[in-house]
């Protein structure tokens, strides 16, 4: 069975790549835009102007998926464009292709949209609302703890080729009572991306105070300071726990608006960032997505599920853009899976050419 993957908020859109795809696949994109309603072209124009916006990234990833659907079924493109993006399908109208879904952080929201729960515009609105909640929660935390706003939150990617389980070892270090003072409790493991790589978040002063100890504990450690334009300590429960209830309520109201709140099963099961478990039911998937918005992304647990934890073996993964971060993670950590990049005109054409040849 196939696994379809979707990237998170850290992957900015290459507008030149996206425009090249749209130019070359103009007929297919016209079908997509017409099927997604009058607001879809406005969303596309917004993406061109705001390629780093969370709403842009989520919508762009969904558009890659819709293009994949059409190109995979060229005999009747009108039927293959997900009409549910404007008018939500009834529960008995499911996609023919059976597959598992996996998104990294924000990408898990795209997984919910692929399950026909809400429109493309809804996806855009939820992604931006989630980001706004995190910004507000961060600002309230700074005020409540009387922290100077010049002390920004940063994100560091840590990698160590000699580590056996770097995320767990870093977490153990953070839990050490003799290492961190009470004022240094803003540091958290945000993403457990592999056994040799993780991302930590925290106030810059707290992170800097830990730099020497990190280098002493982990030989050949590489620290990469990531861009963080919204000053959000992503997946940091100390700061972002308050976002859960309003985010859940916001999504639930959208489901009620669309009449999808009464549905039970997902069209396509989702492997959850929260714990690596597979969500088959909508309320489980929604609950896990909301909780993981303020908890560590346990991607290493997702690899365990992909490699040996699914009822039907996963033998192929289609990794949608923007960007190839998730493609590289799956390729390195799930060696038995045929991992395919679906991020550019060249990779899209290569995939469908190979798929057509295999049919013959």
From Swiss-Prot:
This is Malonyl CoA-acyl carrier protein transacylase, mitochondrial. It comes from Saccharomyces cerevisiae (strain ATCC 204508 / S288c) (Baker's yeast). PANTHER family: MALONYL-COA-ACYL CARRIER PROTEIN TRANSACYLASE, MITOCHONDRIAL. GO terms for cellular component: mitochondrion. It is an enzyme of class 2 (transferase). Pathway: Lipid metabolism; fatty acid biosynthesis. Keywords: Acyltransferase, Fatty acid biosynthesis, Fatty acid metabolism, Lipid biosynthesis, Lipid metabolism, Mitochondrion, Transferase, Transit peptide. Residues 1-24 form a transit peptide. GO terms for molecular function: [acyl-carrier-protein] S-malonyltransferase activity. It is found in: Mitochondrion. Belongs to the FabD family. It catalyses: holo-[ACP] + malonyl-CoA = malonyl-[ACP] + CoA. The active site is at 105, 235.
């Amino acid at each position: 069975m196939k696994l379809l993957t979707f990237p998170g908020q850290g992957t900015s859109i290459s507008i030149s790549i996206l425009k090249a795809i749209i130019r070359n696949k103009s007929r297919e994109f016209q079908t997509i835009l017409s099927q997604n309603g009058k607001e879809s072209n406005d969303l596309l124009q917004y993406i061109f102007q705001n390629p780093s916006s969370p709403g842009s990234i989520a919508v762009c990833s969904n558009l890659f998926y819709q293009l994949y659907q059409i190109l995979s079924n060229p005999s009747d493109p009108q039927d293959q464009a997900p009409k549910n993006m404007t008018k939500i399908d009834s529960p008995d109208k499911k996609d023919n292709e059976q597959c598992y879904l996996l998104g990294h952080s924000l990408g898990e929201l795209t997984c919910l949209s692929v399950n026909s729960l809400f429109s493309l515009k809804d996806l855009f609105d939820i992604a931006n609302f989630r980001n706004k909640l995190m910004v507000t929660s961060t600002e309230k935390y700074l005020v409540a703890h009387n922290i100077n706003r010049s002390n920004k939150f940063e994100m560091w990617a840590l990698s160590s080729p000699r580590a056996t389980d770097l995320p767990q070892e870093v977490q153990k270090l953070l839990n050490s009572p003799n290492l961190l003072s009470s004022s240094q409790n803003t540091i958290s493991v945000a993403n457990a991306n592999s056994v040799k790589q993780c991302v930590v978040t925290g106030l810059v002063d707290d992170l800097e105070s830990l730099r020497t100890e990190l280098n002493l504990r982990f030989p050949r450690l590489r620290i990469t300071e990531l861009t963080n334009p919204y000053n959000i300590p992503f997946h940091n429960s100390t700061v972002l726990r308050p976002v859960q209830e309003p985010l859940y309520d916001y999504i639930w109201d959208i489901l009620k608006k669309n009449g999808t709140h009464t549905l039970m099963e997902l069209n396509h099961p989702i492997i959850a960032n929260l714990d690596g478990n597979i969500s088959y039911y909508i309320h489980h998937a929604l609950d896990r997505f909301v909780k993981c918005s303020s908890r560590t992304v346990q991607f290493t647990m997702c690899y365990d599920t992909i490699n040996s934890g699914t009822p039907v073996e996963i033998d192929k993964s289609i990794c949608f853009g923007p960007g190839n971060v998730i493609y590289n993670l799956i390729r390195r950590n799930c060696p038995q899976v045929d991992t395919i990049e679906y991020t550019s005109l060249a990779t899209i054409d290569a995939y469908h050419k190979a798929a057509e040849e295999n049919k013959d």
